[in-house]
Amino acid sequence: MKANIHPNYHKITVVMTDGTQYTTRSTWGKEGDTLNLDIDPRTHPAWTGGSQTLVDRGGRLSKFKNRFGNIGM
């Protein structure tokens, strides 16, 4: 491997939507940072059968609906 081309790999704490925490290694953030998830495997519609509502992060879902909402099948 070449030296000094890879990102810093360190431990972070991940907090799931139900409050469960675990420590993992990642290139995200800095050593000791906490990553709070908006959606995780326990709440993601793909894994729960679509029973959960979608989280509109930054208005992306609204923007999509405004742009493509009038297209019918």
Curated annotation (Swiss-Prot):
Disulfide bonds: none
GO cellular component: ribonucleoprotein complex; ribosome
GO MF, any single term: structural constituent of ribosome
Keyword annotations of the record: Ribonucleoprotein, Ribosomal protein, RNA-binding, rRNA-binding
SUPFAM superfamilies, alphabetized: L28p-like
Alphabetical list of Pfam families matching this protein: Ribosomal_L31
Protein's GO biological process: translation
The keyword Lipid biosynthesis is annotated on this UniProt entry: no
Assembly behavior: Part of the 50S ribosomal subunit.
Entries under PANTHER family matching the protein: 50S RIBOSOMAL PROTEIN L31, CHLOROPLASTIC, LARGE RIBOSOMAL SUBUNIT PROTEIN BL31A
Functional summary from the UniProt entry: Binds the 23S rRNA.
Family (UniProt): Belongs to the bacterial ribosomal protein bL31 family. Type A subfamily.
UniProt name for this protein: Large ribosomal subunit protein bL31
